[in-house]
């Protein structure tokens, strides 16, 4: 399934989940939700790529919400189909 059809919605949900964790402080619930989202992406290649990136960066064992947040920003920027969609990290405030 082509990420052009569902990618923006998936990224929006990912960043909403991260923002909610910034408000309620429940990092473990946030990580579970993020892993569920990533492990159920409709594109098998996207699912594999994101899961490997999460494992390689020890996201599930981190208790630092901002580490997780900036990881997903970097992942988004690496996958952005057009540089104009990239998030300027210098303008992002920590959660």
From Swiss-Prot:
FAD-dependent sulfhydryl oxidase that catalyzes disulfide bond formation. The complete pathway for formation of disulfide bonds in intracellular virion membrane proteins sequentially involves thiol-disulfide transfer between OPG072, OPG128 and OPG088. It comes from Variola virus (isolate Human/India/Ind3/1967) (VARV). The chain crosses the membrane at residues 9-25. Belongs to the orthopoxvirus OPG072 family. This is Probable FAD-linked sulfhydryl oxidase OPG072. One of its GO terms (molecular function) is thiol oxidase activity. Induction: Expressed in the early phase of the viral replicative cycle. Keywords: Disulfide bond, FAD, Flavoprotein, Host cytoplasm, Late protein, Membrane, Oxidoreductase, Redox-active center, Transmembrane, Transmembrane helix, Viral envelope protein, Virion. Residues 26-95 are virion surface. One of its GO terms (cellular component) is viral envelope. Its EC number is 1.8.3.2.
């Amino acid at each position: 399934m082509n990420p052009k059809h569902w990618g923006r919605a998936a990224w929006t949900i990912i960043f909403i989940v991260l923002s909610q964790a910034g408000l309620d402080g429940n990092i473990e619930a946030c990580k579970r939700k993020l892993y569920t989202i990533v492990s159920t992406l409709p594109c098998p290649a996207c699912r594999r790529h994101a899961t490997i990136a999460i494992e390689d960066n020890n996201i599930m064992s981190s208790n630092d919400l901002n580490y997780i947040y900036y990881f997903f920003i970097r992942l988004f920027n690496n996958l952005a189909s057009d540089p104009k969609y990239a998030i300027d990290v210098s303008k992002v405030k920590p959660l």
